[in-house]
């Protein structure tokens, strides 16, 4: 999220400079990654008027202009022959620097000296490409410094907004944080709109209330679609959005300012003069504003006029009903869409927009009228026209603020310090707080969907109060013996680890289908048949937990839950030498998105995702393992491995065979591992000693190799660890690519190597030397070559 400083200060009046603002935000949990200057312009760049224009005496491609700045007249040469007398332009004078780094100085063009330069928007950093001198649409005061007047000296906070804080995807949201931190009041918008009473044939209907709990529309007439003024262009570009026209720019401006995406339709392109919100059935095709046609999967929220699709709700508008130069009448949409439905639709169609980015995380369902008024006010200011008084607002089931009780004693117990007036901190964040004696009754505003429990409120108090103010104390915790044995404690430790890695624990039946075990024998074990099975597909004891987990995964798929991380610690059973045996194993299965809670992260689970979970477990337990490629029935041949400790197999890992997945109607790549808990506990008896935080920085190097498909990258990893010596701290794979630019039957594998010296800082020269030797050794030993 890019937040221009001047825009932020309109909402909260602060004495802090921008560096202090960045520091306070970061300390409170809103991380400022950088302070940017989006425009690389400086010096005397001023408004001027062309008072005379004539052809260059020695060049047909140039013209000579006399330009008045209010103080003196300059001679300027330009190649833009559309410049005319009377045009108000932007003049860069000697010493000025343009966005492309060009420094202005007097220059001779075939016998005529140009004393400056007439600027295009590209040269000011306001457009990516422009070959025309910018002309102000209306007269302006001469001699005004454009850099200062229009914010081309703007500084911008580049803020990393976590997925749980959609309220901060707006200027007002960040300003609210600063208001709470500083104690200064938040200046909320107070839209001033002139209304006209006029009857109009129009209606709004919601058929899909689940996908669209609230939809509002407002009508404007008589607008003029044209280029946006310079101040609007500059502010949008500073915020990372390109300018299109005054109406579209107004919608983007309001979205950035208030955090609620909005849309404008051309009223006269609505066939039935009505809005009907419905759910897609699947198979429909729609042409969107990105000029691409999409076939809908079913379940998407559609904005229609009863017959034609106008927009993909919460994601993108349609081409047919968009705003064009001849648009005169508008329908202004401000709605609330279900975050889950928007996320699923955007993912299924492969669309990512500023609108879906916000709706996926959750916008405020109860700021709709304010946002609509602000949009109407801004369009009226930029495009003229008038606003109809009637406001269509369909909101069948109002979403009420959550009520949470907060115990005062609990605040001090959790934070470890007494906070004066914690209720006031919450009020500054716009929570409604009632003092109930020994507790607070708190109404959580609907723009804060992340706050659900008492502990969330305490976190809000702590971060605004300042964790740096909390005195550090040594905590003494007495040992408690719960009577658990070593085995139970180890089992609990592994369970807690898997939950901490984002996996959900399941408990399943030990009875499975003998036909599945026979067809896909992941392990070479003889199953134990049941003499009296409870069902025909539960007639043997499982030889692997795989058969249980795949069933759970398939059931979730039927219910549209496709981002899954499952694990189970349980028994497997088999015959060995005529005897019945049972072994406790840890098994895990994962598919779908790698981080389903992070809507900015579209990566899917891969082999290295689930292997990374195992690697972290082995590291924590101090177990040194070796992965060896293996063909395992039921797993994909080139993406499976057995796991060994001291040449003894303790488990296996791999990608589930797509043919097997088809039998369960699972359409996502799925990964599985199974580890013998008894052997894991045995080899985990020696835990790693405590290692202090490194005093010296690490140095990372990456390398991409072209490898034959099926090549075991673990061989390179082991070679790097061995040849790099004690300076190599970590080696791993972080990217695999095959496709365009990669030869057939080859794959590009990118590895990273982390170097660190315990006693000093490594130089680039010595790291480069060691790294190059390692790479060359890998090339020689394995007959491979680097990609870059």
Curated annotation (Swiss-Prot):
Protein name (record): Phenylalanine--tRNA ligase beta subunit
Binding-site residues, Mg(2+): 450, 456, 459-460
Subcellular location per the Swiss-Prot or TrEMBL entry: Cytoplasm
A Pfam family per the record: tRNA_synthFbeta
Phylogenetic placement of the source organism: Bacteria, Thermotogati, Thermotogota, Thermotogae, Thermotogales
GO cellular component: phenylalanine-tRNA ligase complex
Domain of life: Bacteria
B5 domain residues: 399-472
Main localisation: cytoplasm
BP GO terms, sorted: phenylalanyl-tRNA aminoacylation
Molecular-function GO terms, alphabetical: ATP binding; magnesium ion binding; phenylalanine-tRNA ligase activity; tRNA binding
Keywords annotated in UniProt: Aminoacyl-tRNA synthetase, ATP-binding, Cytoplasm, Ligase, Magnesium, Metal-binding, Nucleotide-binding, Protein biosynthesis, RNA-binding, tRNA-binding
UniProt cross-references to CDD domains, sorted A to Z: PheRS_beta_core, tRNA_bind_bactPheRS
tRNA-binding domain boundaries: 39-147
EC number of the protein: 6.1.1.20
Family membership noted in the UniProt record: Belongs to the phenylalanyl-tRNA synthetase beta subunit family. Type 1 subfamily.
Cofactors: Mg(2+)
Record's catalysed reaction(s): tRNA(Phe) + L-phenylalanine + ATP = L-phenylalanyl-tRNA(Phe) + AMP + diphosphate + H(+)
Every FDX-ACB domain range: 694-787
SUBUNIT field: Tetramer of two alpha and two beta subunits.
Family annotation (InterPro entries): aa-tRNA-synth_II/BPL/LPL, B3/B4_tRNA-bd, DNA-bd_dom_put_sf, Fdx_antiC-bd, Fdx_antiC-bd_sf, NA-bd_OB-fold, Phe-tRNA-ligase_IIc_bsu, Phe-tRNA-ligase_IIc_bsu_bact
């Amino acid at each position: 999220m890019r937040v221009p400083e001047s825009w932020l200060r309109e909402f909260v009046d602060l004495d802090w400079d921008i560096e202090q603002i960045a520091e306070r935000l970061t300390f409170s949990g809103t991380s400022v990654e950088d302070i940017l200057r989006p425009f690389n312009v400086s010096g005397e760049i001023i408004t001027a008027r062309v008072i005379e224009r004539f052809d260059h005496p020695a060049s047909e491609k140039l013209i000579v202009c006399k330009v008045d700045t209010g103080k003196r007249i300059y001679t300027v040469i330009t190649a833009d022959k559309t410049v005319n007398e009377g045009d108000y332009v932007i003049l860069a004078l000697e010493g000025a620097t343009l966005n492309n780094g060009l420094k202005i100085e007097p220059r001779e063009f075939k016998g005529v000296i140009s004393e400056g330069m007439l600027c295009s928007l590209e040269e000011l950093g306001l457009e990516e490409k422009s070959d025309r001198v910018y002309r102000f649409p209306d007269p302006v005061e001469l001699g005004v410094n454009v850099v200062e007047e229009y914010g081309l000296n703007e500084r911008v906070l580049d803020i990393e907004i976590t997925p749980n804080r959609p309220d901060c995807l707006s200027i007002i949201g960040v300003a609210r944080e600063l208001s709470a931190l500083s104690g200064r009041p938040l200046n909320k918008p107070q839209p001033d709109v002139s209304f006209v009473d006029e009857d109009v044939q129009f209606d709004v209907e919601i058929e899909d209330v689940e996908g669209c709990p609230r939809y509002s529309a407002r009508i404007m007439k008589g607008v003029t679609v044209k280029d946006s003024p310079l101040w609007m262009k500059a502010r949008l570009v500073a915020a990372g959005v390109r300018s299109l026209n005054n109406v579209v720019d107004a919608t983007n401006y309001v979205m950035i300012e208030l955090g609620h995406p909005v849309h404008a339709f051309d009223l006269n392109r609505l066939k039935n003069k009505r809005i009907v919100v419905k759910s897609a059935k699947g198979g429909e095709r729609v042409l969107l504003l990105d000029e691409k046609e999409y076939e809908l999967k079913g379940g998407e929220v559609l904005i229609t006029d009863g017959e034609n699709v106008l927009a993909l709700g919460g994601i993108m508008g349609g081409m047919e009903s968009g705003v064009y130069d001849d648009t005169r009448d508008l329908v202004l949409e401000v709605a609330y869409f279900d975050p889950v439905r928007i996320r699923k639709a955007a993912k299924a169609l492969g669309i990512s927009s500023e609108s879906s980015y916000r709706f996926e995380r959750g916008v405020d369902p109860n700021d709709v009228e304010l946002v609509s008024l602000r949009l109407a006010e801004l369009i009226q200011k930029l495009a003229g026209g008038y606003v109809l008084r009637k406001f269509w607002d369909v909101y069948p089931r109002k979403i009420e603020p959550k009520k949470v009780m907060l115990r005062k004693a609990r605040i001090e117990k959790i934070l470890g310090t007494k906070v004066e007036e914690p209720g006031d901190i919450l009020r500054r964040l716009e929570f409604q707080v009632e003092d109930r004696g020994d507790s607070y009754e708190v109404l959580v505003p609907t723009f804060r969907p992340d706050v659900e429990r008492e502990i969330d409120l305490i976190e809000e108090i702590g971060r605004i109060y300042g964790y740096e103010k909390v005195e550090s104390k040594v905590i003494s915790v007495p040992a408690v013996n719960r009577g658990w044995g070593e085995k139970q404690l180890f089992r609990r430790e592994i369970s807690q680890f898997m939950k901490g890695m984002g996996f959900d624990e399941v408990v399943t039946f030990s009875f499975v289908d003998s036909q599945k075990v026979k067809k896909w024998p992941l392990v070479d074990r003889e199953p134990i048949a049941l003499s009296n099975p409870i069902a025909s597909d539960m007639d043997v004891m499982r030889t692997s937990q795989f058969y249980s987990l795949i069933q759970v995964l398939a059931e979730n798929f039927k219910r549209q839950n496709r981002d899954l991380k499952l694990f189970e610690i349980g028994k497997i059973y088999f015959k060995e030498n005529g005897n019945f045996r049972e072994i406790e194993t840890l098994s895990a299965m994962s598919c779908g998105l790698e981080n389903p809670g992070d809507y900015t992260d579209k990566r899917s689970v891969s082999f290295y995702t689930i292997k990374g979970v195992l690697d972290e477990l082995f590291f924590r337990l101090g177990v040194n393992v070796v992965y060896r490629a293996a063909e395992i029935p039921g797993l994909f041949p080139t993406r499976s491995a057995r796991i060994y400790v001291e040449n003894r197999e303790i488990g296996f890992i791999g990608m589930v065979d797509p043919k097997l997945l088809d039998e369960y109607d699972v359409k996502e790549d799925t990964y599985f591992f199974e580890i013998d808990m008894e052997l894991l506990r045995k080899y985990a008896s020696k835990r790693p000693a405590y290692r202090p935080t490194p005093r010296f920085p690490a140095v990372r190097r990456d390398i991409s190799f072209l490898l034959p498909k099926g090549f075991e990258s673990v061989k390179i990893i082991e070679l790097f660890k061995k040849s790099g010596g004690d300076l190599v701290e970590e080696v791993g794979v972080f990217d695999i690519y095959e496709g365009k630019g990669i030869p057939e039957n080859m794959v590009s594998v990118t590895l990273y190597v982390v170097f660190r010296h315990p006693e000093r800082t490594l130089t680039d020269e010595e790291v480069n030397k060691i790294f190059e030797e390692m790479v060359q050794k890998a090339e020689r030993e394995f007959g491979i070559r680097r990609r870059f």
